Swiss-Prot record:
Transmembrane segments: none annotated. This is Elongation factor P. Signal peptide: none annotated. Gene3D superfamilies: 2.30.30.30, Nucleic acid-binding proteins (2.40.50.140). HAMAP family: EF_P. PROSITE patterns: EFP. Pathway: Protein biosynthesis; polypeptide chain elongation. PANTHER family: ELONGATION FACTOR P, TRANSLATION ELONGATION FACTOR KOW-LIKE DOMAIN-CONTAINING PROTEIN. It comes from the Bacteria.
Length: 188
């Protein structure tokens, strides 16, 4: 499917020079005083991992990869792979851990994720927007801290470090965004 250079967004997977590239940074739209407007895009090659900056005219059209999306349940780790089960057909799928990169600690047993396939090959895994995790380490609660809006460091059960409000204690469950690893609220 062809998309305008102005429509490119972070996370889009493009077919460029016969390779698959994921847009890794928010594209910069620039309109210089002289010449035509262009879009500066930082991309990462999904096969080799190399990064590249692409500059496209606002009038250019690029090929967006047509991905098939399946709901899968995470079962367990097997070596350097994740073993997932297609929730519709119950087929087991092995996916390399590298696909998740920094988001790997958010993966919990039986979590439902979306796996995006290109030509029947798993390309990306989309985690739920938020997860509920327990605080395993943080400073003690300070009395009267509900009034202030300051944050303190905390380590969650999966080892991720986040900033949490002063009134939270060890053992409490919180909601965390998976895209930028930030605190949202206390879990209900």
């Amino acid at each position: 499917m062809k998309i305008s250079a102005n429509s490119i967004r972070t996370g889009n997977i493009l077919v460029y020079n016969n390779d698959l590239w994921v847009v890794s940074k928010t594209p910069e739209h620039t309109q210089p005083g002289k010449g035509g407007a262009y879009v500066q895009v930082e991309m990462k090659n999904l096969k080799t991992g190399t990064k590249r900056n692409g500059r496209f005219s606002s009038s250019d059209y690029l090929e967006k990869a047509e991905l098939e999306q399946k709901d899968c349940q995470f079962l367990y780790f097997e070596g350097n792979n994740l073993v997932l089960m297609d929730t519709k057909h119950f087929d087991q799928i092995n996916v390399p851990k590298e696909i998740l990169e920094a988001k790997l600690p958010f993966l919990t047993e039986n979590m439902i994720v979306k796996v995006e396939f290109y030509n029947d090959k798993p390309l990306t895994i989309v985690l739920p927007p938020t997860v509920i995790l327990a605080i395993s380490e943080t400073d003690p609660v300070i009395k009267g801290a509900t009034v202030t809006s300051s944050y303190k460091p905390a380590i969650l059960e999966n080892g991720i470090k986040v900033k949490v409000p002063q009134y939270l204690a060890i053992g409490e469950k919180i909601v965390v965004k998976t895209d930028d690893m930030t605190y949202v609220e206390r879990a209900k």
